[in-house]
């Protein structure tokens, strides 16, 4: 996949940053939203990420596995749909990255001209490099794993939260079906958006820079966040 020059955020968007979008009326500004996303937001009366609420006008809290806690300002935002991520990106004058851009930022080492299996290199994931395997039961604060950064300095690209991309889930050129074709092939070209990077709940043996996940644009999964590109 070819990419031209682009910039990618060094970290996923945080709760602190996303709260500014909420407080600036981002959920009321139709011009920021994809038309289908605006219709969904109106029908569902969406005003903030899933499980966010205000116990009083001055504080935001969230629910995590049935427990209520203050919003963790420097943790990656979660419970946002693709439409919400896209609207936020427009609000900050950016966009969501394509999956090719995301993969290049995670994989390419410009000093050697080679691709890495993981952002930090080809060594297997461990607790110093990424938040995986349900060990923390939540994402860490952004930047908590400097040893896991990519050659370009982007952190948190493996683990913590899956990340929305701008790309539709479709077959690569020359794709040949896995023997279990129902794993991915039947989902191609049906409106799914590509997710990359794994989450804090992903098994280490199941993730790599090239792994593709997917979901509907309206889904607000617990384990999904995003970062922006420009």
Place the predicted regions along the sequence by residue.
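Functional-site microenvironments in short loops/helix caps that host divalent-cation chemistry
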Residues: 1, 11, 27-209
């Amino acid at each position: 996949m070819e990419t031209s020059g682009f910039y990618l955020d060094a970290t996923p968007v945080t709760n602190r940053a996303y709260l500014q979008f909420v407080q600036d009326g981002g959920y009321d500004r139709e011009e920021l939203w994809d038309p289908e996303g605006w219709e969904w937001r109106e029908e569902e009366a969406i005003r903030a990420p899933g499980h966010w609420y205000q116990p009083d006008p001055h504080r935001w809290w969230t629910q995590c596995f049935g427990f209520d806690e203050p919003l963790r300002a420097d943790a990656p935002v979660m419970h946002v749909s693709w439409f919400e991520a896209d609207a936020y990106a427009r609000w900050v004058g950016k966009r969501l990255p394509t999956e090719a851009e995301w993969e290049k930022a995670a994989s390419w080492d410009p000093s050697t001209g080679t691709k890495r299996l993981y952002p930090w290199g080809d060594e297997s994931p461990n607790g110093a490099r990424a938040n995986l395997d349900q060990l923390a039961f939540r994402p860490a604060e952004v930047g908590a794993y400097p040893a896991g950064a990519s050659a370009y300095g982007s952190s948190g690209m493996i683990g913590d939260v899956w990340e929305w991309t701008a790309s539709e889930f479709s077959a690569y050129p020359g794709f040949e079906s896995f023997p279990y074709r129902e794993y991915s092939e039947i989902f191609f070209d049906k409106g799914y958006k590509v997710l990359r990077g794994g989450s804090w709940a992903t098994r280490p043996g199941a993730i790599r820079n090239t792994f593709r996940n997917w979901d509907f644009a309206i889904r607000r999964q617990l384990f999904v966040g995003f970062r922006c590109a420009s």
